[in-house]
C-alpha cells in the first residue's frame, strides 16, 4: 500500500496495490502492522457500512471528548467526495479541511484521526461506504458541524 500524508498532520490517503487478472482483482484492504508503522497505534474495534443515494450528504459528524473516533473509510460501490475538518483547537491547521474522492474505481482509503469532523457527499447513483472506527458510537457525544458554524 502507498501511504500519502495529506497537508493536515495525521490525515492519510492510502492507495492499495490492486492485482487484476481475467477473473477480476485482488487487494489487501488492511494490514494492521503496516498501518501502524505508517499511521500509528490505532486499535479499530468495529466496522460499519452505509448505503446512500446520489446527492446525499452525510455529516459533518464528530463525537466530543473521550468518545471521539478515528476512522478508516473507503467506498466499495459508487463514488463520494469525502471531507475531514480539523477541530483540534491546539492544531496549526484548526478549521482547515482535506477533501478526497473515494470510489470503487480508485479503491483509495482515507484515515481521519480523532479530533476531526467527517462527512461525505454521494457523487454516483448510489454509494456503499464502509469504515473502521476505534471507539463505540456514543449518541450523547454526537455532534454535527454546519457550514454556518463559526471556527472557534
Question: Language model features by range: what are they?
Answer:
Residues 102-124:
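Conserved metal-binding segment of the jelly-roll/cupin
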Residues 1-105, 124-126, 136-148:
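Non-catalytic, conserved peripheral segments adjacent to functional cores
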Residues 128-132:
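Active-site scaffold segments
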Residues 112, 149-152:
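Hydrophobic heptad-repeat coiled-coil signature
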Amino acid at each position: 500500500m502507498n501511504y500519502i500524508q495529506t497537508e493536515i498532520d495525521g490525515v492519510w490517503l492510502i492507495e492499495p496495490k490492486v492485482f487484476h487478472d481475467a477473473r477480476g482483482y485482488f487487494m489487501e484492504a488492511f494490514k494492521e502492522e503496516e498501518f501502524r508503522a505508517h499511521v500509528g497505534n490505532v486499535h479499530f474495534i468495529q466496522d460499519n457500512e452505509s448505503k446512500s443515494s446520489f446527492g446525499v450528504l452525510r455529516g459533518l459528524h464528530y463525537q466530543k471528548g473521550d468518545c471521539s473516533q478515528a476512522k478508516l473509510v473507503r467506498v466499495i460501490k459508487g463514488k463520494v467526495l469525502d471531507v475531514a475538518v480539523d477541530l483540534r483547537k491546539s492544531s496549526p491547521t484548526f478549521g482547515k479541511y482535506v477533501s478526497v474522492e473515494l470510489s470503487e474505481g480508485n479503491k483509495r482509503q482515507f484515515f481521519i484521526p480523532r479530533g476531526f469532523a467527517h462527512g461525505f457527499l454521494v457523487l454516483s447513483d448510489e454509494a456503499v461506504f464502509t469504515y473502521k472506527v476505534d471507539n463505540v458510537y456514543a449518541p450523547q457525544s454526537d455532534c454535527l458541524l454546519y457550514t454556518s458554524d463559526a471556527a472557534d
